[in-house]
From Swiss-Prot:
Protein name (Swiss-Prot/TrEMBL): 77 kDa membrane protein
MAP repeat extents: 45-154, 156-265, 266-374, 375-474, 475-584, 586-684
Membrane topology value: Peripheral membrane protein
Secretion signal span: 1-30
Entry keywords, A to Z: Cell membrane, Membrane, Repeat, Signal
Keyword Magnesium among record annotations: no
Amino acid sequence: MKFKSLITTTLALGVLASTGANFNNNEASAAAKPLDKSSSSLHHGYSKVHVPYAITVNGTSQNILSSLTFNKNQNISYKDLEDRVKSVLKSDRGISDIDLRLSKQAKYTVYFKNGTKKVIDLKAGIYTADLINTSEIKAININVDTKKQVEDKKKDKANYQVPYTITVNGTSQNILSNLTFNKNQNISYKDLEDKVKSVLESNRGITDVDLRLSKQAKYTVNFKNGTKKVIDLKSGIYTANLINSSDIKSININVDTKKHIENKAKRNYQVPYSINLNGTSTNILSNLSFSNKPWTNYKNLTSQIKSVLKHDRGISEQDLKYAKKAYYTVYFKNGGKRILQLNSKNYTANLVHAKDVKRIEITVKTGTKAKADRYVPYTIAVNGTSTPILSDLKFTGDPRVGYKDISKKVKSVLKHDRGIGERELKYAKKATYTVHFKNGTKKVININSNISQLNLLYVQDIKKIDIDVKTGTKAKADSYVPYTIAVNGTSTPILSKLKISNKQLISYKYLNDKVKSVLKSERGISDLDLKFAKQAKYTVYFKNGKKQVVNLKSDIFTPNLFSAKDIKKIDIDVKQYTKSKKNNKSNNVKFPVTINKFENIVSNEFVFYNASKITINDLSIKLKSAMANDQGITKHDIGLAERAVYKVYFKNGSSKYVDLKTEYKDERVFKATDIKKVDIELKF
């Protein structure tokens, strides 16, 4: 526990002392190779390298019109490269992370200038620690095959597809789509007309109003027997005849829009634009629309730019406020150009005509989250029981806050961490928090008070926040009972508590479920493991001095009920079968383990069921158990950690990074005796 306090205190002070520091998410990759100074944001003299890419979706390829932009000779990880690839898939083809997970295949191929290539699976989520030099990349090909569900195939068999063409003002569209009907379905001309109008609106943007104002609007139904029928879309008159969908060969839709003289004044001017976000550019596939009023000022133009940034790339006004760069360049047809800052409030009185604009390029380079986000460590004491500083309050955006804002944050963590809601606080005997400032002063605030404060505080001036709650009688809806777990004679200290309801009397069946739950979450012991265990029991110690031993393997429970408030503590004891002394000896494996480079603070001897065949998950479970037993770092603590990874070194010279917060589905096995050492890195 001393080590755990040392880690958390050191890291908490480190976070406060370095507000605005940029933590690299790819520290694992950076550890593998020396840092490339050319990629530093402080080195402004770098040049750019453009890597062309192509996207193929379901066999249909897109021309190489755009490039990924990197700093020249920059060393990047495969994780960073995958993020870039996913970004262009989303912006160019509308393929999201969910689409990739559900796809039949999703991969990209990196072609290097030395003739080699590397294929990366976009669905794997596993990255090597190797770095790539951007100047060595020749091109990138992205290939995605979307998954077609079995249900869709059944629908295809049951559905009947009718090809259609659309001709608007003499311009025809190729037969790329079909109208879908049920096979041998009898439909009316009214239903058919509704389908035709629907595709006119979705494919060509022609509404009912446009059809009424058009010179001509009709569609021709071509039947398989050689006959055809022409229907006027403007008439609104339908015959009572029904058509069998399987008799239709094709449908030709023809619309001539009426051009009134007054429509000349309502011309819709389209200006193409592109967005470059953090060096990744999108194709010019969209336009800014200027209708009715082609003359516009730069203030309105800036508003339109911000709107497309929000719509196309999810960049809000808040993101722009903290961006390193945020500007757009207006290129005119006469060869001139004008650069305008998106965060500026100063606009010229000049007007610009949309027809004079050739294109608009939008450039945004977002700032690091560390500059926008600030973290303040906090502790919670409920009825005198305090928690260590393992978490921080996160303040995003404005560096100044009021006590009203802090109170909202405090209420949120009380609800999340300790299950204390607004109602419990209302009836609490005491509900306060103390703000400790770096200058040595402090201020105590009542959580239940309505604070109206004119002066704002700077988050960076706050050292820590201590929350203190003493619940009243109405707030005591739950009891927290301390427990210990002993597996094969090895016990853990009392770090956690069982949360048991006080609202009603409980049974041993209810208590059994609670005990099994913590065995599963804390030590990875499932119901099946308990069934085959040599011994599985727990002892309930009551405050009146009595105790009750309960067999976890039995499904027979006494009908007695009791109150959780009468329980003093619970000791859980599980003994598992071992194969033989000979096997046990060979399954005991020793290798050094460090935590944040500290040695000999956790056990270096581990017992595996079969040391000759273990997986990464098996190793992770053993390391978590050792940290819980020796240092009191539980699975819950790891889940709240900012970073929890370990690097396993093998005797053959290879190594692998593993995230302790993730459950791996890698079924590849290896020998425990092949492990040379393990380095664990924790950041709270």
